[in-house]
Curated annotation (Swiss-Prot):
Native organism: Mus musculus (Mouse)
Region (Interaction with CLSPN): 1-265
Listed name of the protein: Serine/threonine-protein kinase Chk1
UniProt note on regulation of activity: Activated through phosphorylation predominantly by ATR but also by ATM in response to DNA damage or inhibition of DNA replication. Activation is modulated by several mediators including CLSPN, BRCA1 and FEM1B. Proteolytic cleavage at the C-terminus by SPRTN during normal DNA replication activates the protein kinase activity.
Glycyl lysine isopeptide (Lys-Gly) (interchain with G-Cter in ubiquitin), cross-linked positions: K132, K436
GO cellular component: centrosome; chromatin; chromosome, telomeric region; condensed nuclear chromosome; cytoplasm; nucleoplasm; nucleus; protein-containing complex
Stretches the record annotates as Disordered: 267-331
Length: 476
């Protein structure tokens, strides 16, 4: 069942987990507005409380159509809540077919939107420092949104730019200068990461484990061995652009203004029917008004613009996926109650509400948590009941050598390692829908493409029991 959170708001499902907490989907039971709520346990984040304050402060600065909106924050005891846009289109990695990629026209469109978001961030002096498909979300109109500013920092203030020295990010996406333990400029680092994202979109795989001479794939790239994977799968025009982006020397790396002049970047590609677009401004009228209201009532700490950055922080995981929905159909007062609500109640195991068949009623029911289900391809119906489906999953996990445990209700947590020997954790929910069992996979920690590879492997092993019925989500 849905868990009451603030007046008229319920927590209906977990969107993701991180080192210090999780992200929950909150839905207004009257208006059906949806907001992502990042819940941080400050007791678990005791070693880096300033990082949380910094993340809040940076989020407050942001307002762009290709950046996840921030509605406000609230502290209750040792729990910090951040209220963010809910993106029902899911993560970009879900649109990338392992070892194949996506249609070139889709990759170009997403890359355009990624560039627009990064140009905006750099324009206000912010560098993201962890650009990767797991941190790029899609709204209900398939517009790309940059999310997760936990590693972001200010590199320019009052027209004065500072060099950075903190090594952070996700190794396959970081620029080579980060690994040299010297100071570096911020903007070329984000540009490099965007090039790796473009490679993943076009080829369905990452080019290397890390950009260092100890990595054979990276050495091959520097020696221009483009007859190897992933480069041989990429057409000559986008490959020419990647040759200009993935340049080891930062000063020789192409800048975003020059990327926008590139032949492939400006090449008209057949996109078919044009998708409807969100409003061209950064914030919708109602959410902008809401934003002004909460900003005048909430206390934000200033950004620390000091030049020293002492920690080494690399991520092989998927941080909390922030997701978003626009609130222009209703006034700000409903979300205002969510941000400034007095009574918060925390579920001990929030995902139990996903497996209660009584909630899965008629379409349009505000009590149906699947009304706001994130769109993703990693789910299927089975021909069996819940018990038999669970038994088949168990047998498959044992054959594949996975570690697994049953957690909340009909949920299983699976742990394994990917091809790079990094930890990969995903959760599987068995949900009764229309007298059928939906098996829903969600990445909890690790690389998105590797997660999809394992999903396809499991689905292949279960081919005899997988139903041919399509899963159409999200329901709107």
């Amino acid at each position: 069942m849905a868990v009451p959170f603030v007046e008229d708001w319920d927590l209906v499902q977990t969107l993701g987990e991180g080192a210090y907490g999780e992200v929950q989907l909150a839905v207004n039971r009257i208006t059906e507005e949806a907001v992502a709520v990042k819940i941080v346990d400050m007791k678990r984040a005791i070693d880096c409380p300033e990082n949380i304050k910094k993340e809040i402060c940076i989020n407050k600065m942001l307002s762009h159509e290709n950046v996840v909106k921030f509605y406000g924050h609230r502290r209750e005891g040792h729990i910090q809540y951040l209220f963010l846009e809910y993106c029902s289109g899911g993560e970009l990695f879900d649109r990338i077919e392992p070892d194949i990629g996506m249609p070139e026209q889709d990759a170009q469109r997403f890359f355009h939107q990624l560039m627009a978001g990064v140009v905006y961030l750099h324009g206000i002096g912010i560098t993201h420092r962890d650009i990767k498909p797991e941190n790029l979300l899609l709204d209900e109109r398939d517009n790309l949104k940059i999310s997760d500013f936990g590693l972001a920092t200010v590199f320019r203030h009052n027209n004065r730019e500072r060099l950075l020295n903190k090594m952070c990010g996700t190794l396959p996406y970081v620029a080579p200068e980060l690994l040299k333990r010297k100071e570096f400029h911020a903007e070329p680092v984000d540009v490099w990461s965007c090039g790796i994202v473009l490679t993943a979109m076009l080829a369905g795989e990452l080019p290397w484990d890390q950009p260092s001479d100890s990595c054979q794939e990276y050495s091959d790239w520097k020696e221009k061995k483009t007859y190897l994977n992933p480069w041989k799968k990429i057409d000559s025009a986008p490959l020419a652009l990647l040759h200009k982006i993935l340049v080891e020397t930062p000063s020789a790396r192409i800048t975003i203004p020059d990327i926008k002049k590139d032949r492939w970047y400006n090449k008209p590609l057949n996109r078919g029917a044009k998708r409807p677009r969100a409003t061209s401004g950064g914030m919708s009228e109602s959410s902008s008004g809401f934003s002004k209201h909460i900003h005048s009532n909430l206390d934000f700490s200033p950004v620390n613009n000091g030049s020293s950055e002492e920690t080494v922080k690399f991520s092989s995981s998927q941080p909390e996926p922030r997701t978003g929905l626009s609130l222009w159909d209703t006034g700000p007062s409903n979300v205002d109650k969510l941000v400034q609500g007095i009574s918060f109640s925390q579920p001990t195991c929030p995902e139990h509400m996903l497996v209660n068949s009584q909630l899965l009623g008629t379409p349009g029911s505000s009590q149906n948590p699947w009304q706001r289900l994130v769109k993703r391809m990693t789910r299927f119906f089975t021909k069996l009941d819940a018990d038999k489906s669970y038994q088949c999953l168990k047998e498959t996990f044992e054959k594949l050598g996975y570690q697994w445990k049953k957690s909340c209700m009909n949920q299983v947590t699976v742990s394994t390692t990917d091809r790079r020997n990094n930890k990969l954790i995903f959760k599987i929910n068995l949900v009764e829908m229309d007298e059928k069992i939906l098996v829903d996979f969600r990445l909890s920690k690790g690389d998105g493409l590797e997660f999809k590879r394992h999903f396809l492997k499991i689905k292949g092993k279960l081919s005899d029991v997988v139903s041919s019925q399509k899963v159409w989500f999200p329901v709107t």
